Amino acid sequence: AALAGSPLFRGRFQKAVAISGGLSLADPHAAAQKLAENFAPLAVEDGRFADTASAAEWLLTPGADVREWLCGLEPARIAALGKPAILYADGVVPSRDARSAASLLLLSSATEFSGFVRDDLRPASSAARAYAVKYGSALCRWSSTEAVAEALGGSAPVWLGLIDYGGTDSQTAIPGLGSFHGLPLALFSSESSYSACADLSSAGAQALSARLKQALAGFMTSGSPGWDAWTPQDRAALHFDADSETACITLSSYPDTQESIRAAMAADTSLSAAEKE
């Protein structure tokens, strides 16, 4: 979604599919500080500065020398930082006139955060982990779908697809992970590494897989996945679920807003205010 919306890629996309990947939510100042901290050791390695604090301060300046150095870094050195693309969240969306006008199909799972919380030791209690999964997933899902549609402001058609299968409200439970990050890829292809995370051999899961593939094929060949595009008025989103035998597909308005999710987080009494922080 970020590439398709970038002015640098204007004219290069006719359409694009983004799975669990939208625009950014981070504060620009905080994101810049984070970037500088992560790249500072590389500047020290190159002998530009004796310490990382001085290097980070330099990286925050707008000089051409900073840009030249960053653009000249070997990709392998950047990759060694660990998923650097995630660090580039700055919350800034290009103006509508600057964006690439590409149709988008945006897909996201119901419990995107389940795997991330499982691998994170910081939420010590089961209540804290449940809180992180519930609201982290809701915010991740929103930022990967409707937030993108809102930010693009009608510059191109956008379709939203929500994978409910395996999640809390699904007719089929996936123990431990729910509707996990990467589930759409597993439903698209059994060769995906995410296929090992759940048994998708039931007739219902296979029917759901077929419906997802049909939507993808329709979008790529005809320009529409087969349901209504998102608008600010109806906020259309197609929900993909399945029982043990059949796929269960429903069209409804997007279930949350950023404000409603944050309000629910504040009202949740399962954790104290200190624990939430």
Annotate each PLM feature.
Residues A1, A30-N38, L177-S179:
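NAD(P)H-dependent oxidoreductase Rossmann-fold/reductase module
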Residues G5-L8, V44, P75, G153, ...:
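Sec-exported extracytoplasmic/periplasmic mature domains
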Residues K15, S24, T61-Q206, S222:
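Substrate-gating cap/lid region and adjacent catalytic-acid/histidine neighborhood
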Residues G153-V158, G166-G167, S192-E277:
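Alpha/beta-hydrolase-fold serine-hydrolase catalytic core, especially in secreted/extracellular enzymes
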Residues S6, R10, A31-Q33, L60, ...:
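Extracytoplasmic/cell-surface-exposed regions of Actinobacterial cell-envelope-associated
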Residues A31-R67:
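Helix-rich cap/lid subdomain of alpha/beta-hydrolase
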Residues A1-A30:
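Primarily recognizes the serine-hydrolase "nucleophile elbow" in alpha/beta-hydrolase
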